[in-house]
């Protein structure tokens, strides 16, 4: 009924509008005013958003990956830490598994010029990945990630001196991000910064390192800086207008630390000294605070006590004291020199179940860091820690049916490969592997190749071996080195074609790890998925921009009727 009235009100035939009697016009205006009020109130509070997120996951080591030296990079940075190019199918899998939110960490400085402008191609790629998340109906937290950290090239540090030096660059960055997404709805949140450290790169709290005495003056300066960054972030985002005037924003504590005692009260200062930014434009209720935690799980009694203390502390020192909801933006286990999931598997499952249930009890959203699906598993996509993913979801939602946790056992892919150039290459493995862990590689083709048609090529040694059968094995030798960065299937001539059925890395104990092929250079690859999550043809179904009734984009809409994503709404 309201849409019908909107159409009549938007009709541009002046003669028709003159004939409308005053009483009818008044009725329409009253309906529109009511609709406007409903629209203005529909942008949920941060507390509502955090509760509605359920359980989340981090798309880690992907858009946040960088060359660790501060130099400029192109779009290939997304895969430089060994993760594959992100596909929309991955987000579809996470949604179907029961996850309600994805944190998208992004490192920006390798993609900014000297005038602080973000490369257009990089912004477009970030935009695409954000859309993958939102198009699956999940919440998305977009942040500034390894621009913070403990390396010299990390330019955001928690000192007022650094803040004063980089304030212009920091605000320019957030102004561009905010402008890019200003028309997006309430399921997109911005996170101001990741784990920001002082000039001494101290984790947990300023002046933490034991080789230096605690310096209260230096610590206060760090907390003052954190609060200044947080306020700049809120002010810049709000000033861009559009939906950013009400968007829920996230600020982190110093180092995203979650407090604790440790024999002194200093860790808790990360919570108590955080000042929630003034948010005049949005009013109260649109800011959340984020912390990270990675407990040890060697002793489950101690672990559960630590978890209990954590959530009690977050409630008393943040939610109750400052009136803000809390997001656990990263959580996992300490992995004391090894992978807990492998060596303390039962403890990890028990911990995840307990942690998520406790977080739900305290109305905290949780975002598991990495794991669950990692490396080439993301491309298929499948879970390599399916039982952990299922534990996390069931801890929050209960034994609700309908969620899916595909593994490599559930998926079969074949790759049709056409070599367009002589000596062109297909990636069988990309990303560093150690010959102390793996002893070889197994390749299975649909049929045996012609003699001398193909060969294995190993990098960086560039050692080669002919592929002579439908199933061929490459045994790693000392001549190939202790570390292998890439293995390809090279064609001796242009025009060769083949179908790859399976590629496995063979571990020292004989177990196999399936991998995914991709084009290296001079060849084209078509993937045929026999089972599993079906491919998604990505088209941006919504552009989230706001238009007037004449179809013109409006960047700063005032009062009136507008169109967004094909629907009319009234902005009061």
Regions found by a protein language model. Give the residues of each.
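C-terminal outer-membrane/trafficking sorting elements
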Residues: 1, 7, 529-572
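Bacterial N-terminal signal peptides that target proteins for export
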Residues: 6-9, 13-26
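Sec-dependent N-terminal signal peptides
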Residues: 25-33
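Sec/Tat signal peptide C-region and signal peptidase I cleavage site
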Residues: 36-40
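Active-site mouth of glycoside hydrolases
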Residues: 43-44, 50-261
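Extended, alpha-helix-rich binding/interface surfaces that flank or overlap catalytic cores
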Residues: 56, 347-408
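Extracellular glycoside hydrolase catalytic/binding regions
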Residues: 79, 83, 172-175, 179-182, ...
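Extracellular ligand-binding interfaces
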Residues: 411-485, 490-513
């Amino acid at each position: 009924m309201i849409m019908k009235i909107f159409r009549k009100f938007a009709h541009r035939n002046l003669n028709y509008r003159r004939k409308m009697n005053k009483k009818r016009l008044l009725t329409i205006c009253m309906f529109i005013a009511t609709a406007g009020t409903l629209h203005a109130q529909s942008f949920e509070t941060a507390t509502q958003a955090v509760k509605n997120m359920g359980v989340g996951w981090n798309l880690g080591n992907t858009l946040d990956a960088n060359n660790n030296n501060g130099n400029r990079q192109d779009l290939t940075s997304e895969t430089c830490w060994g993760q594959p190019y992100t596909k929309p199918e991955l987000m579809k899998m996470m949604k179907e598994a029961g996850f309600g939110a994805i944190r998208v960490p992004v490192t920006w400085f390798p993609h900014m010029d000297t005038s602080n402008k973000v490369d257009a191609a990089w912004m477009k790629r970030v935009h695409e990945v954000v859309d993958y998340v939102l198009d699956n109906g999940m919440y998305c937290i977009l942040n500034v990630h390894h621009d913070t950290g403990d390396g010299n090239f990390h330019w955001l540090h928690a000192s007022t001196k650094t803040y004063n030096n980089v304030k212009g660059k920091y605000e320019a960055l957030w102004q561009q991000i905010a402008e890019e997404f200003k028309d997006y709805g309430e399921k997109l949140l911005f996170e101001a910064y990741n784990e920001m450290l002082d000039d001494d790169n101290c984790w947990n709290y300023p002046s933490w390192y034991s080789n230096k005495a605690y310096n209260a003056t230096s610590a206060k300066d760090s907390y003052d800086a954190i609060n200044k960054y947080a306020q700049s972030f809120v002010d810049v985002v709000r000033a861009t207008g559009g939906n950013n005037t009400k968007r829920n924003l996230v600020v982190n504590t110093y180092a995203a630390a979650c407090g604790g005692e440790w024999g002194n009260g200093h860790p808790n200062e990360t919570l108590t000294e955080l000042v929630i930014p003034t948010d005049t434009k949005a009013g109260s209720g649109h800011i959340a605070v984020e912390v990270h935690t990675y407990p040890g799980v060697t002793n489950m009694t101690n672990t559960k006590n630590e978890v209990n203390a954590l959530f009690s502390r977050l409630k008393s020192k943040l939610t109750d004291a400052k009136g803000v909801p809390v997001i656990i933006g990263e959580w996992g286990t300490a992995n004391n020199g090894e992978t807990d999931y492998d060596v303390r598997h039962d403890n990890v499952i028990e911990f995840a179940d307990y942690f998520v249930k406790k977080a739900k009890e305290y109305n905290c959203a949780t975002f598991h860091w990495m794991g669950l699906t990692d490396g080439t598993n993301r491309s298929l996509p499948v879970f390599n820690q399916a039982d952990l993913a299922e534990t996390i979801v069931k801890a929050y939602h209960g034994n609700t049916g309908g969620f899916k946790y595909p593994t490599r056992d559930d998926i079969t892919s074949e790759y049709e490969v056409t070599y367009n150039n002589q000596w062109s290459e297909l990636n069988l493995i990309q990303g560093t592997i150690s010959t102390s862990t793996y002893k070889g590689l197994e390749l299975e083709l649909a049929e045996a190749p012609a003699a001398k048609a193909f060969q294995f090529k190993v990098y960086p040694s560039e050692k080669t071996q002919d592929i002579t059968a439908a199933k061929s094995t490459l045994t790693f030798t000392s001549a190939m080195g202790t570390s292998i960065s890439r293995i390809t299937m090279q064609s001796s001539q242009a025009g060769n074609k083949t179908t790859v059925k399976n590629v496995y890395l063979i571990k020292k104990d004989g177990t196999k790890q399936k991998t995914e092929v991709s084009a290296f250079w001079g060849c084209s690859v078509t993937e045929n998925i026999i089972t599993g999550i079906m491919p998604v043809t990505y088209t941006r179904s919504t552009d989230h921009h706001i238009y007037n009734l004449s179809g013109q984009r409006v960047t700063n809409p005032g009062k009136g009727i507008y169109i967004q994503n094909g629907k009319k709404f009234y902005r009061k």
